[in-house]
Amino acid sequence: MSERESWHKEIDLFLVAMGYFTRIPMPKWVEVDSDKLNKASRYFGLVGLLIGLLSAIVFWLTQNWLPAGVSVLLAMLVGVLLTGGFHEDGLADTFDGFGGGWTAEDKLRIMKDSRLGSYGAIALILALLLKWQLLVELALYDPVVAGSALIVAHTVSRVVAASIIFTEKYVRDDETSKSKPLSQHQGINELFILVASGVLVLLFLKGLAALSLLLVMIGLRRLIVVIFRRQIGGYTGDTLGAAQQICEIVCYLVLLIVGSIL
């Protein structure tokens, strides 16, 4: 394979990843199959970086003319519009299932129900409020830090969530599932590039903040995996969305705590 063909292949995989995670229209020449989707997992972190960067740009462009709370809300809105609330939906479904079901089968059945239950609604409202409040506090502390936090959190949270695919069992037996192709034939190259994107984005942060966030994310991933195993024996697409949302919130929390003591 020539260098040009190799670059074209990687660009194609990135676009497949972007098409999976966002509502951004893809070029007509981009074709998606299970093999491509598996290999595209290496770029899930970079898609998060793109979403975070666009959100941060909106925040930076508006924060000089609007109250911090409004600028943060607009930045959050950009993220939701870009993804179609993909991860937020997973968070709500996961909390509905984990909160309302007794057995793993009950939980999986409830999670598949398109209706929003009380557990999911509460989780979704609290998650959005937490993100908004933490980002507002970061914005009041330093607008540059707040924008950087958006970039880092959107990237790192997706890296952590996607890494679960490589070590855990996919438990939903549903051929129409959007996440099932990702559960098959993941390679070490995909994992290496995925993790590297998460580590490199920490360069946006100072040394203590980067180290603190790295250690917390490692511990949080372990905790999330243990909970998923106990609840349903593995993961589904919904639980990956929940993992992303939880990790994003914790990213903001860690950066706020570290920033307050520096």
From Swiss-Prot:
Taxonomic superkingdom: Bacteria
InterPro entries: CobS
A matching Pfam family: CobS
Keyword Lyase: no
Pathway, per record: Cofactor biosynthesis; adenosylcobalamin biosynthesis; adenosylcobalamin from cob(II)yrinate a,c-diamide: step 7/7
Transmembrane annotation, as ranges: 43-63, 66-86, 120-140, 146-166, 191-211, 242-262
Disulfide bond entries: none
Listed GO MF terms: adenosylcobinamide-GDP ribazoletransferase activity; cobalamin 5'-phosphate synthase activity
Catalytic activity as recorded in UniProt: alpha-ribazole + adenosylcob(III)inamide-GDP = adenosylcob(III)alamin + GMP + H(+); alpha-ribazole 5'-phosphate + adenosylcob(III)inamide-GDP = adenosylcob(III)alamin 5'-phosphate + GMP + H(+)
Required cofactor names: Mg(2+)
Keywords carried by this UniProt record: Cell inner membrane, Cell membrane, Cobalamin biosynthesis, Magnesium, Membrane, Transferase, Transmembrane, Transmembrane helix
EC number(s) stated in the UniProt entry for this protein: 2.7.8.26
Record NCBIfam families: cobS (TIGR00317), PRK00235.1-3 (NF001277)
Task performed by this protein: Joins adenosylcobinamide-GDP and alpha-ribazole to generate adenosylcobalamin (Ado-cobalamin). Also synthesizes adenosylcobalamin 5'-phosphate from adenosylcobinamide-GDP and alpha-ribazole 5'-phosphate.
Protein name per UniProt: Adenosylcobinamide-GDP ribazoletransferase
Organism: Shewanella sp. (strain W3-18-1)
